[in-house]
Amino acid sequence: MSRRVDYRYDECGLGNVILKDLTVCIDDDGDEVVTIPNVNLLHQTLLVQVAGKESGLLPKEIRFLRTEMGLTQAQLGQLVGRDGQSVGRWERGEMPIEQAHEMILRMAAGEHADQVVTSMMELATRTMPAASERPYLIDASDPDHYRALEAVAA
């Protein structure tokens, strides 16, 4: 037996990802069994959504983009012209990422996903901090075609 649920996908490290209409199975004891099919496609969908968000990146989002691109802190630091310790400070929220470095990270993430996130001019306007954190909503009804949904303002 199975049913569809809206599942909070904390396993990715972002803490604000909702998989809409995810199919979960019910085992013989009546407990829900959650499996995330096609997780690589899901993470690529999230990577594009995070890289293209309309406000500044949060520390956990910087870490998510870096790890999804398969980079160490030192490698990301080299990519943006900083050291690995600076990247660690950004990811721990000890210091904010500079606008130019955030733009490079976003462009690299889009390139990694074989997508253009947006233009440099547009990215420059998206690096300002947000007043509140919006969830990332993913349509999980068809795991072969995950797609981002627009978050409703709180």
Where are these regions (language model features)?
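N-terminal flexible/basic segments that precede or flank functional cores
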Residues: 1-56, 111-154
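Short, amphipathic alpha-helical "recognition" segments used to contact nucleic acids or chromatin
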Residues: 55-71
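Conserved hydrophobic/aromatic packing and binding residues within compact polymer-binding modules
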Residues: 62, 76-77, 87-90
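Generic structural signal for hydrophobic core residues of well-folded globular domains
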Residues: 68, 108-112
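Short, solvent-exposed secondary-structure capping/transition elements
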Residues: 71-79
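Short coil turns linking two alpha-helices in DNA-binding domains
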Residues: 72, 83-86
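Residue-level detection of the helix-turn-helix DNA-binding "recognition helix"
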Residues: 81, 92-94
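Short, basic-rich loop-to-helix N-cap that marks the start of a DNA-contacting helix
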Residues: 94-106
